C-alpha cells in the first residue's frame, strides 16, 4: 500500500517495474558482471524510533569540542563574539532566507534595501565612499582589491606585509598564477609589526599597491599614517585589510588615506562555523567606484517620486560582459551580509564601541596575567589578539588545555619557523576574568 509521505513502497516498485517490462530490480543490473556485483544486503542497522535516534545523535555531538563546551581563546581570523538574538530571528524570515537577487532585481525591494543598508554601514565603519554588496570572505576581498589596483594603475607589483593573514597571502599567490607579469613582494616583520624601513625601500614607481592588515595577523596595530606617507609619492594604491569590529575603536583606514578597505564581517552576527561561510566587505574611494567587483545597490526614485533601490553600474558585472567584467564574482553573501547588518544595527555605534573597548581591556588584562606568570608577551600595540612565547610545542599545550575545558590559541609555528612555540591568543568580550585567570594559570603549569 502506498503511503502519502513515504516514497518507494513495494507497490511503487512493482508499478514501475511493470511499466518498463522488467520482472525484478536485479534484472535492471544484468549488464553488470556478476563477479563484481554485490549479492548481499548492505550492512546497515535497522531503523530506530525518532526519539532514540535523536538521543544517539546528541551523544555523538557531545563528544565534540565546541565554544559551548569550552571557553575559547582561538582567533586568527574567526572570533567568538556576542550575537544579538534578533539576528537569527530576522535572517530566518522566509523573505530573506530563501531570497535570491534576480536579474530583474527591482521586484525584490526588501532584499535590495537590506544590501543598501549593509553598504552604508560598511562605509561608516571604514570612512570610505563606496562599498559593494559583499564578497565571499575577507581573503577573497583582499585578492580582488589587489587585482583592482593592478588594473587601475597599469603597474605590475604588489607590495604586501608579511603581517597579513597567511591564507590571504596564499589566495593572492593563487590569483597571481593566472595573470602575466604580476609580482608579489612580501615585506618582513620587525617583531610582529611590518618593518617600515624595508617597506619604504621596496616601494617604487612600478608599485601598483601596498597592502597591510589592521590589526595584523599577529594582533599588532600597524602605523597606517606613516605607511600612507610612503605610498603617496609613488602614486600607488593603499589597501588595508581591517577587522570591522576594531574600527569601532581604532581610527578607520579611510581617515589615514586608504584607497581600498577590505575585510570580513564575521565578528558581526556570523558564528564560528567550521570553514565558513563568512562575508567579505569591499570599500573604496569614489574614484574607484566603477572598478569595484561584485554588485552595487543604489538608491533612486520611481516615476511617482517614491524611494526605491536598484542594482547600479551593472556594466561592470560578468553577467553583462563577462570578458571585460571587473571581476567574475556573481552571487554574493547576501544572507550573511544581512546578519552582519542586523547585528551592527542592533548594537548601534555606541554598542560597537563598547564591545571593542571590552575586547581591548580583556586582551590587556590577559597580557598582564601572562607576564605575571613569567611568559614572554611580544611587545606591540594590539586590539584583541597578541603573541605569547611558550617553552613547549603549542600543539601539546593545546591538547592539555582542552582537557581543562579551554580551546587554546593558534599555533603560529604552523605558518612560520620564526614563531615556533608561539601562541596567538585571542580574547574577546565573551571571556570573563575568571576564565582568563584560570586559562593563564593552567597554561603556566603546562609550560613548566
Swiss-Prot record:
Any one GO molecular-function label of the UniProt entry: glycine dehydrogenase (decarboxylating) activity
InterPro entries to which the protein is assigned, alphabetical: GcvPA, GDC-P_N, GDC_P, PyrdxlP-dep_Trfase, PyrdxlP-dep_Trfase_major, PyrdxlP-dep_Trfase_small
SUPFAM superfamilies for this protein: PLP-dependent transferases
EC number per UniProt: 1.4.4.2
Cytoplasm keyword on record: no
HAMAP family referenced in this protein's UniProt entry, alphabetically: GcvPA (MF_00712)
Function, as annotated: The glycine cleavage system catalyzes the degradation of glycine. The P protein binds the alpha-amino group of glycine through its pyridoxal phosphate cofactor; CO(2) is released and the remaining methylamine moiety is then transferred to the lipoamide cofactor of the H protein.
Descriptive protein name: Probable glycine dehydrogenase (decarboxylating) subunit 1
Amino acid at each position: 500500500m502506498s503511503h502519502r509521505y513515504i516514497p518507494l513502497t513495494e507497490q511503487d516498485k512493482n508499478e514501475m517495474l511493470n511499466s518498463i517490462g522488467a520482472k525484478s530490480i536485479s534484472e535492471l543490473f544484468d549488464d553488470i558482471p556478476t563477479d563484481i556485483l554485490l549479492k548481499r544486503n548492505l550492512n546497515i542497522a535497522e531503523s530506530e524510533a525518532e526519539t532514540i535516534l535523536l538521543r544517539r545523535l546528541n551523544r555523538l555531538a557531545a563528544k565534540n569540542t565546541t565554544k559551548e563546551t569550552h571557553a575559547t581563546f582561538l582567533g586568527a581570523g574567526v572570533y567568538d563574539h556576542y550575537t544579538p538574538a534578533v539576528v537569527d530571528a530576522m535572517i530566518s524570515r522566509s523573505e530573506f532566507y530563501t531570497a535570491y537577487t534576480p536579474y530583474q532585481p527591482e521586484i525584490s525591494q526588501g532584499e535590495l534595501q537590506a544590501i543598501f543598508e549593509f553598504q552604508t554601514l560598511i562605509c561608516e565603519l571604514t570612512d570610505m565612499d563606496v562599498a559593494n554588496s559583499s564578497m565571499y570572505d575577507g581573503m577573497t576581498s583582499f585578492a580582488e582589491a589587489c587585482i583592482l589596483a593592478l588594473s587601475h594603475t597599469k603597474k605590475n607589483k604588489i607590495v604586501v606585509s608579511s603581517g597579513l593573514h597567511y591564507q590571504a597571502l596564499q589566495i593572492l599567490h593563487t590569483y597571481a598564477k593566472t595573470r602575466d607579469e604580476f609580482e608579489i613582494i612580501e615585506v618582513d616583520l620587525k617583531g610582529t609589526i611590518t618593518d617600515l624601513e624595508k617597506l619604504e625601500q621596496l616601494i617604487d614607481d612600478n608599485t601598483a599597491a601596498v597592502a597591510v592588515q589592521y590589526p595584523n595577523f599577529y594582533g599588532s596595530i600597524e602605523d597606517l599614517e606613516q605607511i600612507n606617507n610612503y605610498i603617496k609619492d609613488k602614486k600607488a594604491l593603499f589597501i588595508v585589510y581591517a577587522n570591522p569590529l576594531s574600527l569601532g575603536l581604532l581610527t578607520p583606514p579611510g581617515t589615514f588615506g586608504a584607497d581600498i578597505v577590505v575585510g570580513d564581517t564575521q565578528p558581526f552576527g556570523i558564528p564560528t562555523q567550521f570553514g565558513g561561510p563568512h562575508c567579505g566587505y569591499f570599500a573604496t574611494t569614489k574614484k574607484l567606484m566603477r572598478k569595484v567587483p561584485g554588485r552595487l545597490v543604489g538608491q533612486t526614485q520611481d516615476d511617482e517620486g517614491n524611494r526605491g533601490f536598484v542594482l547600479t553600474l551593472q556594466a561592470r558585472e560578468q553577467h553583462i560582459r563577462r570578458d571585460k567584467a571587473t571581476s567574475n564574482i556573481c552571487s554574493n553573501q547576501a544572507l550573511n551580509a544581512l546578519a552582519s547588518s542586523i547585528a551592527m544595527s542592533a548594537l548601534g555605534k555606541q554598542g560597537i564601541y563598547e564591545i571593542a573597548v571590552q575586547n581591548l581591556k580583556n586582551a590587556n588584562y590577559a597580557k598582564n596575567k601572562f607576564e605575571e606568570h613569567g611568559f614572554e608577551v611580544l611587545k606591540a600595540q594590539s586590539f584583541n589578539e597578541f603573541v605569547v612565547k611558550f617553552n613547549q610545542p603549542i600543539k601539546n599545550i593545546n591538547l592539555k588545555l582542552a582537557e581543562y575545558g579551554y580551546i587554546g590559541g593558534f599555533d603560529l609555528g604552523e605558518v612560520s619557523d620564526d614563531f615556533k612555540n608561539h601562541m596567538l591568543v585571542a580574547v574577546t568580550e565573551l571571556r570573563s576574568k575568571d576564565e582568563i585567570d584560570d586559562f593563564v594559570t593552567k597554561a603556566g603549569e603546562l609550560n613548566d
